[in-house]
Amino acid sequence: MALNLQDKQAIVAEVSEVAKGALSAVVADSRGVTVDKMTELRKAGREAGVYMRVVRNTLLRRAVEGTPFECLKDAFVGPTLIAYSMEHPGAAARLFKEFAKANAKFEVKAAAFEGELIPASQIDRLATLPTYEEAIARLMATMKEASAGKLVRTLAAVRDAKEAA
């Protein structure tokens, strides 16, 4: 379907606005994936706070200008599906990684986080980032473990002091 100039400008404005508020972006090639599977992916994306859109490469290049995702420009080749993580930096990467496991034809091209290009081979770096809740839980576990260790060492020191006296 041919797009007129106003439609193209609207697409660029929409994607650019989303890019400015996004935490990370992942680019993939969805050629060969069935419509049903793509619908499932889009639904999972909405639930995970991921904005997904298939956009023409020239429009996408214009949309990412001046954003931290400008480093992805070289990945805009062939059919391009872009996903922006809006709530958690690893959400889109995690979603695409899981989807690629189940669908051999789905290929992750690259990702970007804080202006750094992450090649597809290293997508796990972004996908394994803990969520906010997971990070807080790990921190609390570490703090709790450290205080318990201090208590044990203190009690051992008191016991040793009593035995020495």
Curated annotation (Swiss-Prot):
GO terms for cellular component: cytoplasm; cytosol; cytosolic large ribosomal subunit; large ribosomal subunit. The modification N6-acetyllysine is found at residues 37, 105. GO terms for molecular function: large ribosomal subunit rRNA binding; ribosome binding; structural constituent of ribosome. It comes from the Bacteria. HAMAP family: Ribosomal_uL10 (MF_00362). Forms part of the ribosomal stalk, playing a central role in the interaction of the ribosome with GTP-bound translation factors. Protein L10 is also a translational repressor protein. It controls the translation of the rplJL-rpoBC operon by binding to its mRNA. Ribosomal protein L8 appears to be an aggregate of ribosomal proteins L7/L12 and L10. Belongs to the universal ribosomal protein uL10 family. This is Large ribosomal subunit protein uL10. It comes from Escherichia coli (strain K12).
